[in-house]
Amino acid sequence: MINNLKRKKAVLELSNGMKFEGKLIGYDAAVSGEMVFNTGMLGYSESMSDPSYIGQILVFSFCLIGNYGVPKLENDNFLTALGHESSSIKTQGIIVSEIFDESYHYGSMIPLEQWMIEQKVPGIAGIDTRYLVQTIRNTRNLFGWIVPEGCKKENTIRKFPFIENFTKDEYVDPSKFNLMPTVSTKERKVFGTGKKKVAVVDCGVKWNILRMLVDRGCQIELVPWDTDFSTVEADGWLISNGPGDPRNTGDLVERVKELLKGDKPVLGICLGHQIISLASGAKIKKMPYGHRSHNQPVFIIPGQKAFMTSQNHSYMVDPATIAKDWSLWFENANDKGVEGIKHKTKPFMSVQFHPEASSGPNDTAWILTEFINKL
């Protein structure tokens, strides 16, 4: 456990005027970001390294974070880097009720706080995170500053990488910007030696998606988000997860429309699901507070078979706008939101949740197998 008596004070300043005082953890610097929360009991290293969280301050509602440290990361090798979804922390900062400053696990590389310091990521402990989660849930578009005692906002070291001019005291909504150039690979890369080749459009892909494709015998070509798809030879396409508003992704939707004119299998995951939905003619709307947890139940349609899923998104498909040649595939059991759509005649499908999990339940990993079987 942390010793609060030896720690600097830090304040979380919210855009609605509220302030929460706690103790600084991690790196000593001020940061700003969109406030989001995750209700998972574990998987903090996967969440913090998930590119979908870029530009956001992540609140963990569970009472104790960090007790198993951070798993080893060997040479940025996604095949062996279990517990990591990219090569670095992507969150602006974190808020926890309590952090464990040691690590008791055979696979641990370093304690969580040491990882944060090395990656220059600050956080605050000692805050009632469940009350903070309620505040975020009840306030649409909430933003915040983590400000350590004696630290000036203009000295922030994790400025938004997608904004050229960032001024102090500014609350920035990252979803207003095209975040693809920040998180996508800059060059095409090939992994695996399988007979079937999948082109993965990197919108901020989680490493476990790549792992599961390779484990299932696929060769994958990871391509930048702005790639001319006509220059890529593949048996099928996967549009990956990623951060931000799917309507602020440049001409990606138009290029995916061209893919949907063909007959090769296409799978979308999370942001990729929203991109495919827009390309098919559906509309997207922002949710009041999003889904970010490991315990989101979904029903497969038709039928009433349920699956537990891992989710991380702020936007959803408007069910009234699903195109006539597409059908509802999955529905959220809690709020009846669209969790997946499927083309009625072509091998196109997309899901709002994460079938690759990491972290979370593996109930829907079969979706990747179904996609591969269509190649």
Where are these regions (language model features)?
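Catalytic beta-strand/loop cores that center a nucleophilic Ser/Cys/Thr
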Residues: 305-346
